[in-house]
Amino acid sequence: MKQCEGMVFSDNLAAAYVAAVVELFNKEHPDRYLGRTALQKLLYFARAMGAPLPFSFEIYTYGPYSDGLSFVVEGMLADETLEDTSQDQARYSNYRITEQGRYLLEKYGEHLNPHKGVLREVVRIFGGFEPSTLELIATLHFLVQRLKRQGSGRPQEEEVVRRFLEIKGEKFPRGAVSSWYKALEQSGLIE
């Protein structure tokens, strides 16, 4: 196994999970952009679906957000295991894996391989959505999970939609929020 020189921040399992999701996304959706918001949401759903990611998420401007994940991504960019190919990096990102990033996949393969199916499924299901749709879906899912932890059992749809609209205001129409709630319920992501 070839070792890459100069990897200061990203020679760890957390970065390997990020690299795996970026690589899977680039293969599944080669013509789509993978920016900060979408990457956060894909890894949020990977964790929600059982991948043992070391990131914790809290609600933020664009839905569930992890400071730890942002730190890992910044470290990967600094170590050049990940690159941002966007033409206007101040406004948006477009992440791609590098050769050094592929080294992480090889080095941490035994840890990643048991979870590649979940990662692949997350990228397949959610990778085609626009970041704003991912924001809506992930925020709904996050709220259901939070309300479940705070109360007894699964919260009612109306309570989740009400909380969602308190957080997001008028950014999303109530009908769209309700429709996505039902879609998450039917898919089994809300139990």
How would you describe each model-predicted region?
Residues M1-E191:
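Domain-edge interaction signal
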